[in-house]
């Protein structure tokens, strides 16, 4: 394994960590409706659990309401039940074959709780990035030990890995700030 392989690998893994963090943030409710909120809701479709997006069309009715249109009429009750049981604090209402999912306004206390959750998720993501840095530095040390690279090369590569770490940690901080602002906006 070369220095370039190590740097390339750690950057790809850091980018995947950022993507996973973005997905986690998308699941945190802000009071504003977005279809991504229901992405992880699973519906019982003839005995197997499938994502809601595979049995229904998700649309935004307005800023505070998601419209869910199941493709089969007999699925309306099952989709509504799945949304209700998804533990998102949502109360869907059915009108014919359209399920309306209004977003209840967040209380001040709930907003503060959510900002704490966002900060916690951010810290978890930063720890993942730092662990990747540690793994890369250990791989570099192994290359020096095996006499494949010089200590100067290791130091330069280590500096590059640190720059990648700083860049990704800053990106996480920015995402956390943006999400907190979104949550605290009434």
UniProtKB/Swiss-Prot annotation:
Belongs to the RRF family. InterPro entries: Ribosome_recyc_fac, Ribosome_recyc_fac_dom, RRF_sf. Responsible for the release of ribosomes from messenger RNA at the termination of protein biosynthesis. May increase the efficiency of translation by recycling ribosomes from one round of translation to another. It comes from the Bacteria. It comes from Burkholderia multivorans (strain ATCC 17616 / 249). Keywords: Cytoplasm, Protein biosynthesis. Pfam families: RRF. GO terms for biological process: cytoplasmic translational termination. Disulfide bonds: none annotated. Its main location: cytoplasm. It is found in: Cytoplasm. GO terms for molecular function: ribosomal large subunit binding. One of its GO terms (cellular component) is cytosol. This is Ribosome-recycling factor. PANTHER family: MITOCHONDRIAL RIBOSOME RECYCLING FACTOR PSEUDO 1 (PTHR20982:SF3), RIBOSOME RECYCLING FACTOR (PTHR20982). Signal peptide: none annotated.
């Amino acid at each position: 394994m070369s220095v370039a392989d190590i740097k390339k690998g750690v950057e790809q893994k850091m980018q995947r960590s950022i993507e996973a963090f973005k997905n986690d943030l998308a699941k945190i409710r802000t009071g504003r409706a977005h279809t991504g909120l229901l992405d992880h809701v699973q519906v019982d479709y003839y005995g197997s659990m499938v994502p809601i997006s595979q049995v229904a069309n998700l649309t935004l009715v307005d800023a505070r309401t998601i419209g869910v249109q199941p493709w089969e009429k007999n699925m309306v009750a099952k989709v509504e039940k799945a949304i209700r049981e998804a533990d998102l604090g949502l109360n869907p209402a059915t009108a014919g074959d359209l399920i309306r999912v209004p977003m209840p306004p967040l209380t001040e206390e709930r907003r503060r709780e959510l900002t704490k959750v966002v900060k916690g998720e951010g810290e978890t993501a930063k720890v993942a990035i730092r662990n990747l840095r540690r793994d890369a530095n250990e791989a570099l040390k192994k290359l020096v030990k095996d006499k494949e690279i010089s200590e100067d090369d290791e130091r330069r590569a280590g500096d590059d890995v640190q720059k990648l770490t700083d860049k990704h940690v800053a990106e996480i901080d920015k995402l956390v700030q943006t999400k907190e602002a979104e949550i605290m906006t009434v």
